[in-house]
Curated annotation (Swiss-Prot):
Residues in coiled coil: none
Cofactor note: Binds 1 Mg(2+) ion per subunit.
Post-translational modification: The disulfide bond which can form in the large chain dimeric partners within the hexadecamer appears to be associated with oxidative stress and protein turnover.
Site positions for Transition state stabilizer: K324
Subcellular location: Plastid, Chloroplast
Post-translational modification N6,N6,N6-trimethyllysine, affected residues: K4
NCBIfam families: PRK04208.1 (NF003252)
List of residues binding substrate: N113, T163, K167, R285, H317, S369
Molecular-function GO term, any one: magnesium ion binding
Protein name as annotated: Ribulose bisphosphate carboxylase large chain
Keywords from the UniProt entry: Calvin cycle, Carbon dioxide fixation, Chloroplast, Disulfide bond, Lyase, Magnesium, Metal-binding, Methylation, Monooxygenase, Oxidoreductase, Photorespiration, Photosynthesis, Plastid
Cofactor(s) needed by this chain: Mg(2+)
């Protein structure tokens, strides 16, 4: 036939509505907003082309390979209800386009280039279906939910955490003191803030030592296993690993990483180290809102959550749901299930565009954190269930009597909610009543309830 130079429409090659998706394909759902005058088929095909084998003009080297084998295909387009000129474009990518076990490569391919494309006004990646064959190339979370419970010997309830505040400015010794008080009072974990790395007022090594001392002391006094998320995030991968190694030498149970600012490559290395060395890995999602907050451009958090489960982490922050809109609650619970469960059915009402089978990849505990306090406990227990970490920063340290009583208040509230639920009571309806009853035999909880009573909780 010979080589025919020139520019041709993407849709001639990359829009294939008759394509039957394969079990090994990576499937993507994009929310596409084309520029005025660009037909949706062309926009969808452009996304498929630019994120796989295509470029803007025909090149003679196309003849040296089999495009049919390697090209991404836009196989379905549907208009978004209630939005003008916005479509969901479904794209299938052949498995061979991706390096095994590399979240970094997967993202570079799928979202690396196409988001700046001129034919599109905006583009958002809403969901990915990761095929079983690709899932199996990832180690995933270092340990997962069941192994974590066995390590901690804690069952049948959510775990409790607290971020140490003020996040910047405390000396290492005072920081360790705050950690000890919270753990001693009844929390399971305390946490380094995401921006606590190694600053002039508190170098990482000093912090690690004082926190380890706090953990050991609290464990000895309570007879429970305790942890503090030691943030190993650093300016280089080597420095990050050095901090993780030191944490292991101290014998602490868990370290922490900011996976978006630190990057997927660093995160996956750390996750492998954590599995090999028995460390749990807590993941903070600093920077996520830069990527996921705009509703028609960027990447939805459920995709970032799936990517984290592949890269590896035992906990990840996932919003609180509390006091938010009803719809957001369903969407949040959708990606919470994607983090924890082994098999998730497609359910558009919860934002889940594809059925996802994780084939026994360990699950991740969702962490609810941010602006929550004791009055929220019944709702949180009901919404998140046992497999979660509930984190109260100000809701612990803001207690009028101090950190330890703040921790006591949270633990009492949690145990009361779990007991009430196990007795068959309705937490959504009777939540406030359950907390009030518990106040009668816990002055610490009563004091906490008094401080935050004005912050109402609407279901």
């Amino acid at each position: 036939v010979g080589f025919k130079a020139g520019v041709k429409d993407y849709k001639l090659t990359y829009y294939t509505p008759d394509y039957e998706t394969k079990d090994t394909d990576i499937l993507a759902a994009f929310r596409v907003t084309p520029q005025p005058g660009v037909p949706p088929e062309e926009a969808g095909a452009a996304v498929a082309a630019e994120s796989s084998t295509g470029t803007w003009t025909t090149v003679w080297t196309d003849g040296l390979t089999s495009l049919d084998r390697y090209k991404g295909r836009c196989y379905h387009i549907e208009p978004v209800v209630g939005e003008e000129n916005q479509y969901i474009a479904y794209v299938a990518y052949p498995l061979d386009l991706f390096e095994e076990g590399s979240v970094t490569n997967m993202f570079t391919s799928i979202v690396g280039n196409v988001f700046g494309f001129k034919a599109l006004r905006a583009l958002r990646l809403e969901d990915l279906r990761i095929p079983v064959a690709y899932v199996k190339t990832f180690q995933g979370p270092p340990h997962g939910i069941q192994v974590e419970r066995d390590k901690l010997n804690k069952y049948g309830r959510p775990l409790l955490g607290c971020t140490i505040k003020p996040k910047l400015g405390l000396s290492a010794k005072n920081y360790g003191r705050a950690v000890y008080e919270c753990l001693r009072g009844g929390l399971d974990f305390t946490k380094d803030d995401e921006n606590v790395n190694s600053q002039p007022f508190m170098r990482w090594r000093d912090r690690f030592l004082f926190c380890a001392e706090a953990i050991n002391k609290a464990q000895a006094e309570t007879g429970e296993i305790k942890g503090h998320y030691l943030n190993a995030t650093a300016g280089t991968c080597e420095e990050m690993m050095k901090r993780a190694v030191f944490a292991r030498e101290l014998g602490v149970p868990i370290v922490m990483h900011d996976y978006l600012t630190g990057g997927f490559t660093a995160n996956t290395s750390l996750a492998h180290y954590c599995r090999d060395n028995g460390l749990l890995l807590h993941i903070h999602r600093a920077m996520h809102a830069v990527i996921d907050r705009q509703k028609n451009h960027g990447i939805h958090f459920r995709v970032l959550a799936k990517a984290l489960r592949m890269s590896g982490g035992d906990h990840i922050h996932a919003g609180t749901v509390v006091g938010k809109l009803e719809g957001e609650r369903e969407i949040t619970l959708g990606f919470v299930d994607l983090l924890r469960d082994d098999f998730i059915e497609k359910d558009r009402s919860r934002g889940i565009y594809f059925t996802q089978d994780w084939v026994s990849l360990p699950g991740v505990l969702p962490v609810a954190s941010g602006g929550i306090h004791v009055w929220h406990m019944p709702a949180l227990t009901e919404i998140f269930g046992d497999d979660s970490v509930l984190q109260f920063g100000g809701g612990t340290l803001g207690h009028p009597w101090g950190n330890a009583p703040g921790a006591v208040a949270n633990r009492v509230a949690l145990e009361a909610c779990v007991q009430a639920r196990n007795e068959g009571r309705d937490l959504a309806r009777e939540g406030n009543e359950i907390i009030r009853e518990a106040c009668k035999w816990s002055p610490e909880l009563a004091a906490a309830c008094e401080v935050w009573k004005a912050i109402k909780f609407e279901f």
